Swiss-Prot record:
Residues 32-167 form the MPN domain. Pfam families: JAB (PF01398), RPN11_C (PF23594). InterPro entries: JAMM/MPN+_dom (IPR000555), JAMM_MPN+_peptidase_M67A (IPR050242), MPN (IPR037518), RPN11_C (IPR056263). The gene is RPN11. This is 26S proteasome regulatory subunit RPN11. It comes from the Eukaryota. It comes from Eremothecium gossypii (strain ATCC 10895 / CBS 109.51 / FGSC 9923 / NRRL Y-1056) (Yeast). Belongs to the peptidase M67A family. PROSITE patterns: MPN. Keywords: Hydrolase, Metal-binding, Metalloprotease, Protease, Proteasome, Zinc. The keyword Protease applies.
């Protein structure tokens, strides 16, 4: 009985001590918003450094306790050979920040990014030390890891991390509190868990926001120019494309004929919903024919222009 009382008293004292040392925790709703410009610059810098690791700093603002806004990044003159990068060049950083302020970019450093070409998004022991030095300057600093090898068009392999406080681990508390159902955490992979995810650091939500100017920039990335029409295509390849387009047109024409026969037996109300959510054979046939005609007209004109120019 005495032993049970001593055990209950020790648990009570631990609870009182934990309550006395209670401190504000980060929230699982906290999201890192990365602009399109910053994301493109990170990917371009990371791809240029393959197979080496590269790093840079992120500029932005801490809007509130739930939002970290990244508007721009700039590369640092460092590279790594393994899973780590060298220390940050303070002189280069100071000069770069002064030059950016002259151009009107007066945001503060909200964290850093580096690449892991081909081996996923996680933090090595040296990366953890680098992140700890950033968090000594600002406790909300963010470490972003991007993998340029695994990233493909439409899906960027990227993740954001922040260290777990050792005091939280000692008190056996959760590193973050959950106050809303907003936000979606990605399911961690085995590789990240092996390298200390949710033990030494945790992952943050990432979202992307686009302004009207950035949206216009992205729409013009793969926009064809007037020189594209003067490019000659291989005649055998062009013949194969035309043959496939002709076979496709025949199939669509058969579907269109079948559609006309079916429409004779349908009521007016059934006709209105006949092709809702389905492919309209008439519209599809018209689009295919117009595209084939345009491509062949351009091809013939290009061949004529090139033959005259070569003479």
């Amino acid at each position: 009985m005495d032993r049970l009382q001593r055990l209950m008293m020790s648990q009570r004292s631990n609870m009182i001590g934990a309550a006395a040392t209670e401190m504000p925790l980060d929230d699982t709703k906290e999201t890192v918003y990365i602009s399109s410009l910053a994301l493109l610059k990170m990917l371009k810098h990371s791809r240029a450094g393959v197979p080496m690791e590269v790093m840079g700093l992120m500029l932005g603002d801490f809007v509130d306790e739930y939002t970290v806004n990244v508007v721009d990044v700039f590369a640092m003159p460092q590279s790594g050979t393994g899973v780590s990068v060298e220390a940050v060049d303070d002189v280069f950083q100071a000069k770069m920040m002064d030059m950016l302020k002259q151009t009107g970019r007066d945001q503060m450093v909200v964290g850093w990014y580096h690449s892991h070409p081909g081996f996923g998004c996680w933090l090595s022991s040296v990366d953890v030390d680098t992140q700890r030095s950033f968090e000594q300057l600002n406790s909300r600093a963010v470490a972003v890891v991007v993998d340029p090898i695994q990233s493909v068009k439409g899906k960027v392999v990227i993740d954001a991390f922040r260290l777990i406080s050792p005091a939280t681990v000692v008190r056996n508390q959760e590193p973050r509190q959950t106050t809303s159902n907003v936000g979606l955490l990605n399911k961690p992979n085995i590789q990240s868990l092996i390298h200390g995810l949710n033990r030494h650091y945790y992952s943050l939500n990432i979202d992307y926001h686009k302004t009207s100017a950035e949206l216009n920039m992205l729409m013009n990335l793969h926009k064809e120019q007037w020189q594209s029409g003067l490019k000659m295509h291989d005649y055998k390849e062009k013949e194969r494309i035309n043959l496939e387009a002709t076979k496709k047109s025949v199939r669509i024409a058969e579907q269109y004929t079948k559609r006309i026969e079916e429409e004779k037996e349908l009521t007016e109300d059934e006709l209105k919903t006949r092709y809702v959510g389905k492919q309209d054979p008439k519209k599809h046939l018209s689009e295919t024919a117009e595209r084939v005609l345009e491509e062949n007209i351009v091809s013939v004109l290009t061949a004529g222009v090139n033959s005259v120019a070569i003479k």
